[in-house]
Regions:
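Short, well-ordered alpha-helices that flank and scaffold nucleotide-derived cofactor binding pockets
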Residues: 22, 26, 51, 75-79, ...
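Catalytic core of DAGKc-family lipid kinases
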Residues: 31, 40, 79-191, 195
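Short Gly/Thr/Asp-enriched flexible loops that form oxyanion-binding sites at enzyme active sites
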Residues: 68-84
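Glycine-rich phosphate/pyrophosphate-binding beta-alpha loops
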Residues: 137, 141, 194-207, 277
Length: 301
């Protein structure tokens, strides 16, 4: 009999996934799986669920939660050298990576996709020793998901992120950074940067429209310091996916980046990694090609 481990975060999103547990078990038992479930009891304990897979002959690992939960599970998989296909159920507030894989918003439909979808080898990013599947970001908006109240986030969803970001804009100071690739060094005052593995971040589905999780490269997008009215125009371009050629955008592709802050007063600036608080600058970012197996709902990821 095949074995599947389901790991879920009961606090993710609207907290409704628990109502689908029996349907999940019934669906997978119906096609010959022995089902084991791990329910997160506190922040940071999803690693314990992944540990339960070690040397237990599992065939499939499934995580239900948002980008942060997926990130935690993936880091645990890499830590314990677990080479199993990962199915993702988008049960969080932000589900950018699941969207990239074509996973449906309907939870029960996801069960079918995980059972019938294609297993793909995809790239992983690493920043200062921590893995990320979708994005590493810094600057404006990077701390939004860490500062926003959980109830506020769960009630308003992505709108909560945007409202908090707008609140930050008038008082945010540009960050002077040095961006290094294998071939060039750029010094610029910027409002924010994104290192993308997938195409979307923060619900913006077209922000990394040229990115691919199978191309062996990461996409860097940085927004240069500029007047607020120009940011408003750039925001419209981002929504339309027409921002990469804008003069106020730095756009690079490479397999590694180094980002340093040129002003010591910003030395405590932290990053965001898949929606969770990340390391402080400076950042060393690398790509690991085809490091993870995921279940996808689309052929070309």
């Amino acid at each position: 009999m095949k074995k599947v481990k389901l790991i879920y975060n009961p606090m993710a999103g609207n907290r409704n996934f628990r109502y689908y547990l029996d349907q999940f078990i019934e669906k997978f038992q119906g096609v010959g799986y022995e089902v084991s479930v791990f329910r997160s009891a506190q922040e940071g304990d999803l690693d314990l669920g992944v540990e339960q897979v070690i040397n237990q002959d599992y065939d499939l690992l499934v995580v239900a939660g948002g980008d942060g939960s997926v990130n935690e599970v993936i880091n645990a998989m890499m830590k314990h050298d677990i080479d199993l296909p990962l199915g993702i159920i988008p049960a969080g507030t932000a589900n950018d990576f699941a969207v990239h894989l074509g996973m449906p918003a309907d939870i029960e439909t996801c069960f079918d996709v995980i059972l019938e979808g294609e297993v793909k080898q995809v790239d992983l990013g690493e920043v200062n020793g921590r893995y990320f599947i979708n994005v590493c970001a810094g600057g404006l908006l990077a701390n939004v998901s860490h500062e926003i109240d959980l109830e506020f986030k769960n009630t308003l969803g992505k709108l909560g992120y945007y409202l908090k970001g707008i609140e930050q804009l008038p008082k945010f100071k540009p960050i002077p950074v040095e961006i290094k690739t294998k071939e060039q060094v750029i010094e610029e005052d910027i409002y924010l940067f994104l290192i993308l593995n997938g195409k979307s971040a923060g619900g913006f589905k077209k922000i990394g429209k040229k990115a691919s999780i199978t191309d062996g490269q990461l996409d860097l997008i940085a927004v240069k310091a500029q007047p607020l009215h120009e940011i408003a125009l750039l925001f419209i371009k981002i929504l339309q996916g027409e921002h990469l050629a804008d003069e106020n955008i730095i756009y690079l592709k490479d397999s590694c980046f180094e980002i340093n802050c040129l002003d010591q007063s910003y030395s405590s600036s932290s990053s965001d990694v898949d929606g969770e608080k990340g390391p402080q600058l400076p950042l060393q970012i690398f790509l690991h090609s085809q490091a993870l197996k995921v279940v996808s709902n689309i052929s070309n990821v």
